[in-house]
Amino acid sequence: MFPILETERLILREVVPQDAQNIYSYFSNDLVTKHYGMDTMTQLADAESLIQAFATNFSQQRAIRWAIERKDELGLIGTIGFNLWSKIHKRAEIGYELHPDFWRAGYTSEALNIVTEYGFNELGFTRIGAVVYPENTASNQLLLKNGFEKEGVLRNYMYQNEQAHDVNMFSKVKR
């Protein structure tokens, strides 16, 4: 069963096929994908495939991805979750994205806190990592503000649009 999480303003729930249009609306926007590590979507089928990948990865316990939805208005505004989930090593990487209309309103921070807490307390993680492009100032600051520590730079770690990119490596460990 997929866990539903709630904060003061948000419901985090399973991403479902009906979310495809909303996901496509922001992943087809270069402002979102330029810091995300994936090419910009060009058709709705790309979003449908991504949703299927989320479901497959969850069923195989390799990843979990929540839809971020505001309590005061239905409709996905972004997603957040864990990738590279290792039960043996009790760790995962967290990733997130939000539609630009909802940037700088504290939603990502709110979701990040409850998902991190869930990872430590319910999934048994002792380490949660995050990789962020150095030029993505907002995301770098978000992680630092929420208790993640910068560990260093991974050179040529990600490829996007056929170009290598360095990333900042962050982590938060269970104390």
Regions found by a protein language model. Give the residues of each.
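A generic membrane alpha-helix/interface feature
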Residues: 46-49, 55, 99, 165
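Hydrophobic residues in alpha-helical segments
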Residues: 27, 36, 58-59
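A generic local structural motif
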Residues: 52-54, 156-157
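Acyl-donor (CoA/ACP) binding surface of acyl/acetyltransferases
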Residues: 1-33, 65, 69-175
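A generic secondary-structure signal
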Residues: 53-57, 118
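Conserved GNAT-fold acetyl-CoA-binding loop/helix
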Residues: 33-53, 64
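Short loop/turn motifs at secondary-structure junctions and domain boundaries
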Residues: 57-61, 148
